[in-house]
Amino acid sequence: MKALWVALVVTLLAGCRAEVEPEPEPEVQLGQEQPEWQGSQPWELALGRLWDYLRWVQTLSDQVQEELLSTQVTQELTALMEETMKEVKAYKAELEEQLSPVAQETRARLSKELQAAQARLGTDMEDLRSRLAHYRNEVQAMLGQTTDELRNRLASHLRKLRKRLLRDAEDLQKRLAVYRAGAVEGAERSVSALRERLGPLVEQGRLGTATTSTLGSQPLRERAEAWGQKLRGRLEAVGARAQDRLDKMREQLEEVRAKVEEQASQMRLQAETFQARLKGWFQPLVEDLQRQWAGLVEKVQQLAVGTTPTPAASKNQ
């Protein structure tokens, strides 16, 4: 498996680093059939639907030409292209999750190469859509004139674009296969590492089982008595510690209660002393105020009696 993985990576890198100018694509005869697209992954099935629709467009039948004058063909192709690229991204994300155990450098390089192949496929689709839109504009501009030359030129462009689309799709398919091979190898490596980690634990479990079997050969009554004595000793020790703690807590509570009563008595005496002191301060002042008030009332009464006129004096006046 590792040898296959290395061979695939070397082949892929050699194809990426080659800087040879692409050869001109040979003209395909009108009656010559191009190879079919095959695949079982969701993105391959989506691309197959796009491939079949493009083959129907390439026939340039009367129905195709009629729909080319509208936007229906462009809309259908756009929907199929978006579906294909969506499935490619989903499949790539799934492989990236499986590729996590592989080295970071290798994973980054493969991801970059895969993105480049994916971008080329998207460019081919965009060129195809632009070519059809350009043809529609040219036909609409030549209404009432013969369009045989435009149709033949479109057929030639479609054959070339379809061939380039197939080439880039196969390239993407190969890179995804390399990506998947790396994911499988990473998964196998993770399983091996997990097996190495679990090996000592399994051995310890086996030894523990053997020890338990040896202990099981002893008489059950002896083991029960030994466990009972240990449990009794532990319970007695716990009870003794609990009793000591209760005695200490009782003593502490008595000390706290005595201190509280003492402080309460001191506060009561201080309050009584302060009350008596306040009374001694204010009692003379209150008595003096009472005397002054009584004298003031008496003077007011005398003034009132002295200023009241007699009846005879009032009459003479």
Swiss-Prot record:
**Pfam families given for it?**
Apolipoprotein
> What is one process in the GO biological process aspect for this record?
very-low-density lipoprotein particle clearance
What coarse category fits the chief subcellular location reported for this protein? secreted
PTM notes: APOE exists as multiple glycosylated and sialylated glycoforms within cells and in plasma. The extent of glycosylation and sialylation are tissue and context specific. Glycated in plasma VLDL.
Binding-site positions, heparin: 161-164, 228-235
Q: Where is this region: Lipid-binding and lipoprotein association?
A: 209-289
Tell me the Gene3D superfamilies matching this sequence: Apolipoprotein, Apolipoprotein A-I
Location of the region described as LDL and other lipoprotein receptors binding in the Swiss-Prot/TrEMBL record: 157-167
Record-listed Methionine sulfoxide modification sites: 142
Instruction: Give the signal peptide range.
Output: 1-18
Q: Name one GO molecular function term.
A: cholesterol transfer activity
Q: Where is this region: Homooligomerization?
A: 265-317
Function noted in UniProt: APOE is an apolipoprotein, a protein associating with lipid particles, that mainly functions in lipoprotein-mediated lipid transport between organs via the plasma and interstitial fluids. APOE is a core component of plasma lipoproteins and is involved in their production, conversion and clearance. Apolipoproteins are amphipathic molecules that interact both with lipids of the lipoprotein particle core and the aqueous environment of the plasma.
Write out the similarity annotation: Belongs to the apolipoprotein A1/A4/E family.
State the protein's name: Apolipoprotein E
